[in-house]
């Protein structure tokens, strides 16, 4: 074998070795690239899962927040309705109490009107009735019950109940000329109209008749 032939073989072997090294390097790079791609894909999948979990958690928190708000609103409504029911019950009980007390007041006032005040023997009875009446009126006043006494005032159908009408010279028509029974208000709201007598205009005289 000549020296030139040996040299050519060595060059071919070196080139082959270089090609093998390059190929191995390329394969390693490709393998590393594939591995990196797999790692990135796995990490991206984890990121996607975490984002989904976060979105789900945020949605759950929002739903729970809405539920809490709705529950609080419902509790507030229940409390308000309960307070209204209690207030209605209190007003009803107070109206019933006032009605029963007013019957006693009416009876005592009628007793004072009908008793003979000129008779000295009735003096003690009169004082006792007056004290009892004043005590009832004071108690009613504490609960917001006040008398409506429209004597000499214009007739108001929202506050007064006309029992009769009468002509009275010198008095304007539709004026309360007598109070047969006082009316009463409870905290500014009418619970019993006053029974009254009302003046009326005199009939018109036809001058041509």
Swiss-Prot record:
Subcellular location, record wording: Cytoplasm
InterPro entries (alphabetical): GrpE, GrpE_coiled_coil, GrpE_head
Entry annotated with the keyword Ribonucleoprotein: no
Gene Ontology terms: cellular component: cytosol
Entry annotated with the keyword Chaperone: yes
One Pfam family this sequence matches: GrpE
Listed transmembrane segments: none
BP terms from Gene Ontology: protein folding
GO molecular-function term, one example from the UniProt record: protein-folding chaperone binding
Major localization listed first in the record, in broad terms: cytoplasm
Sorted UniProt keywords: Chaperone, Cytoplasm, Stress response
Matches recorded under PANTHER family: GRPE PROTEIN, GRPE PROTEIN HOMOLOG, MITOCHONDRIAL
Subunit structure: Homodimer.
Protein family according to the UniProt entry: Belongs to the GrpE family.
Function per UniProt: Participates actively in the response to hyperosmotic and heat shock by preventing the aggregation of stress-denatured proteins, in association with DnaK and GrpE. It is the nucleotide exchange factor for DnaK and may function as a thermosensor. Unfolded proteins bind initially to DnaJ; upon interaction with the DnaJ-bound protein, DnaK hydrolyzes its bound ATP, resulting in the formation of a stable complex. GrpE releases ADP from DnaK; ATP binding to DnaK triggers the release of the substrate protein, thus completing the reaction cycle.
Protein name (database record): Protein GrpE
Organism per entry: Colwellia psychrerythraea (strain 34H / ATCC BAA-681) (Vibrio psychroerythus)
């Amino acid at each position: 074998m000549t020296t030139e032939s040996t040299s050519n073989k060595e060059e071919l072997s070196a080139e082959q070795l270089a090609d093998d090294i390059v190929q191995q390097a390329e394969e390693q790079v490709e393998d590393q690239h594939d591995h990196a791609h797999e790692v990135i894909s796995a990490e991206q999948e984890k990121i996607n899962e975490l984002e989904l979990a976060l979105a789900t958690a945020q949605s759950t928190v929002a739903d729970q927040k809405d539920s809490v708000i709705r529950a609080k609103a419902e509790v507030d409504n229940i409390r308000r309705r309960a307070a209204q029911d209690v207030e209605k019950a209190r007003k009803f009980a107070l109206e019933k109490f006032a009605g029963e007390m007013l019957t006693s007041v009416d009876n005592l006032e009628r007793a004072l009107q009908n008793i003979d005040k000129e008779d000295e023997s009735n003096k003690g009875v009169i004082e006792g009735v007056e004290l009892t009446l004043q005590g009832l009126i004071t108690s009613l006043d504490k609960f917001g019950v006040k008398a409506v006494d429209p004597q000499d005032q214009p007739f108001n159908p929202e506050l007064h109940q006309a029992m009769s009408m009468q002509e009275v010279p010198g008095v304007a028509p539709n004026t309360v000329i007598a109070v047969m029974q006082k009316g009463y208000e409870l905290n500014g709201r009418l619970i019993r109209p006053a029974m009254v007598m009302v003046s009326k205009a005199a009939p018109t005289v036809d001058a041509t008749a």
